[in-house]
């Protein structure tokens, strides 16, 4: 139960370690600022949490109930809202901005986002199935093979790997290292790759799992 931040993936680049000179591949994320739009307490809601928003939009992009909710917090219209549960939310106030400063260099974070959508894909591309022979009279090139038994059970079991929508799913990459923080521009440089293409919405939170 700890606070995170919403951000946008800008792309990938590399930076060099000052001591070893080794190139480090990093993803640049525009993190926040995320104003607090609601503070929940045990007295009013039964649990402690804060709700934050991200990405300013025009008023016509939101409905009236949401505009009224944001007006109570005294913030401009925001596209995305997310809630973080806390043990004690008393330290936060409406309108307070959450910035990239909540993380430090060397921190481990979990990054959640939507992967790149690749449309309807076949067995080899989606599940890495082995294809059949391309010559020697083979008529099985990219077919899936057997999908189950015959009359009994007389159906294909749920979960069978088949062709279908590939990508465009919610994925969390865990225990990525924060390489650098740019407080002035609210940028976070994260070692390695994160889900999605440039422009993807990301949810960055402190790592929940530790160890190998």
Curated annotation (Swiss-Prot):
Region feature (Disordered): 131-155
Domain of life (superkingdom): Bacteria
A Pfam entry, by short name: Ribosomal_L3
Role played: One of the primary rRNA binding proteins, it binds directly near the 3'-end of the 23S rRNA, where it nucleates assembly of the 50S subunit.
Gene Ontology molecular functions: rRNA binding; structural constituent of ribosome
Cross-referenced Gene3D superfamilies: 3.30.160.810, Translation factors (2.40.30.10)
Disulfide bridge map: none
Subunit structure: Part of the 50S ribosomal subunit. Forms a cluster with proteins L14 and L19.
Keyword Oxidoreductase among record annotations: no
Descriptive protein name: Large ribosomal subunit protein uL3
Keyword Flavoprotein annotated: no
Keywords: Ribonucleoprotein, Ribosomal protein, RNA-binding, rRNA-binding
CC annotations in GO: cytosolic large ribosomal subunit
GO biological processes: translation
PANTHER family for the chain: 50S RIBOSOMAL PROTEIN L3, LARGE RIBOSOMAL SUBUNIT PROTEIN UL3C
Family according to the record: Belongs to the universal ribosomal protein uL3 family.
């Amino acid at each position: 139960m700890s606070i995170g931040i919403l951000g946008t993936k800008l792309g990938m680049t590399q930076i060099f370690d000052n001591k070893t000179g080794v190139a480090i591949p990093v993803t640049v994320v525009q993190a926040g600022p995320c104003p607090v739009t609601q503070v929940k307490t045990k007295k009013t809601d039964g649990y402690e949490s804060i709700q934050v928003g991200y990405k300013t939009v025009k008023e016509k992009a939101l409905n009236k109930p949401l505009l009224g909710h944001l007006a109570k917090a005294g913030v401009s219209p925001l596209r995305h809202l997310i809630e973080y549960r806390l043990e004690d939310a008393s330290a936060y106030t409406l309108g307070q901005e959450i910035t990239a400063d909540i993380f430090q260099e060397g921190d481990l974070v979990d990054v959640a986002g939507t992967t790149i959508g690749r449309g309807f894909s076949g067995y080899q591309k989606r599940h890495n199935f082995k294809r059949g022979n391309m010559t020697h009279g083979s008529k099985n090139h990219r077919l899936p093979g057997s999908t189950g038994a015959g009359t009994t059970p007389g159906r294909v079991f749920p979960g069978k790997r088949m062709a279908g929508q590939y990508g465009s799913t919610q994925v969390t990459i865990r225990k990525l290292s924060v390489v650098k923080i740019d407080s002035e521009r609210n940028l976070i440089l994260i070692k390695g790759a994160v889900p999605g293409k440039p422009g993807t919405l990301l949810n960055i939170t402190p790592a929940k799992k530790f160890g190998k």
